[in-house]
C-alpha cells in the first residue's frame, strides 16, 4: 500500500527536477512530502496530477518549476507564489481574433466545481517580495517572440508570467478538492528562446527558499 503524504510537490520536467539542489531533495526525502514529475504542457500535466492525487491522497499540492516573465514586474531570478492562474489558447481563433472559452459563452467545466478560464489559488497577498497581484498565464505554447508577448498582454494585462502547466494542475486539484500552491522561478523573459540568457539555477534556488518557508523546513 502506498503511504499517504501531507504534501505532493510536482515539477513538470526532468530538466527542472535536476535543477533542484541535492540538499533540497534530501530535505524533502526526510519528510512525509513526495516529489514527482507531472509532465510538460497543459494536457499531460493535468492528467498526471490527477493520477498522482489518486495514488498518494495528499493534503495539498505544490507545483514548482520555472516560468517566463511577461512584463518585468517580477525580475529574472525571483520566485513567485501565484494568486491566480488563467488559461490562454483554448477557445477559437488566434492573435487579435482569439476568443477564450468564457468569451465564447462556455465554461471549461459547467457544474460544481465550476471551472472557467481563471482559477483563484489564494486571496492576493502583496508584500515586499510580491508587490503586485500575481496572475500566472498558462499557455498551450510558450511565447516565441515579443509579438507573442504583446498579444497575450493585450488579452490579459494583469498576467505577470507564463507557463504551460499551472491551469491544468489547478483544474485537477479543483476536481479533487485539494488546495494548490504554485511557486515558480522566473528564469527568463517570455519570448526569449535563447537559453544562454536564462537564469534557471538562480530561479530554482529562489523556489527552494520559498518552498522551505511554506513547508516549515
Describe these PLM feature segments.
Residues 1-57, 74:
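N-terminal short beta-loop-beta anion/metal-coordinating cradle
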Residues 6-10, 62, 80:
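Conserved beta-strand elements of the Class I
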Residues 18-21, 71-74, 91, 192-193:
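Short glycine-/acidic-enriched loop or helix-start segments at secondary-structure transitions
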Residues 59-61, 159-160:
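Conserved acidic residues
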Residues 70-157:
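Mid-sequence, gly/pro-rich, charge-dense loop/helix-turn segments that line enzyme active sites
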Residues 140-182, 187-192:
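A C-terminal functional module that forms or caps the active site or interfaces directly
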Residues 158, 178-180, 185-217:
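Regulatory input/activation interfaces that engage signals or partners
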Amino acid at each position: 500500500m502506498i503511504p499517504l503524504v501531507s504534501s505532493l510537490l510536482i515539477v513538470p520536467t526532468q530538466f527542472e527536477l535536476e535543477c533542484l539542489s541535492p540538499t533540497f531533495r534530501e530535505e524533502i526525502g526526510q519528510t512525509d512530502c513526495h516529489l514527482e514529475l507531472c509532465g510538460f504542457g497543459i494536457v499531460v500535466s493535468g492528467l498526471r496530477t490527477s493520477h498522482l492525487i489518486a495514488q498518494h491522497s495528499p493534503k495539498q499540492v505544490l507545483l514548482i518549476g520555472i516560468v517566463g516573465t511577461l512584463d518585468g514586474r517580477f525580475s529574472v531570478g525571483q520566485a513567485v507564489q501565484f494568486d491566480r492562474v488563467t488559461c490562454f489558447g483554448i477557445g477559437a481563433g488566434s492573435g487579435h481574433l482569439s476568443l477564450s472559452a468564457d468569451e465564447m459563452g462556455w465554461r471549461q467545466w459547467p457544474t460544481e466545481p465550476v471551472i472557467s478560464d481563471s482559477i483563484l489559488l489564494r486571496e492576493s497577498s502583496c508584500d515586499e517580495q510580491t508587490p503586485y497581484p500575481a496572475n500566472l498565464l498558462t499557455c498551450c505554447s510558450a511565447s516565441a517572440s515579443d509579438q507573442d508577448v504583446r498579444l497575450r498582454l493585450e488579452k490579459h494585462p494583469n498576467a505577470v508570467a507564463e507557463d504551460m502547466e499551472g491551469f491544468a494542475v489547478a483544474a485537477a486539484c479543483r476536481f479533487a478538492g485539494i488546495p494548490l500552491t504554485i511557486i515558480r522561478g522566473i528564469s527568463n523573459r517570455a519570448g526569449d528562446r535563447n537559453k544562454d540568457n536564462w537564469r534557471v539555477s538562480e530561479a530554482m534556488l529562489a523556489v527552494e527558499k520559498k518552498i522551505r518557508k511554506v513547508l516549515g523546513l
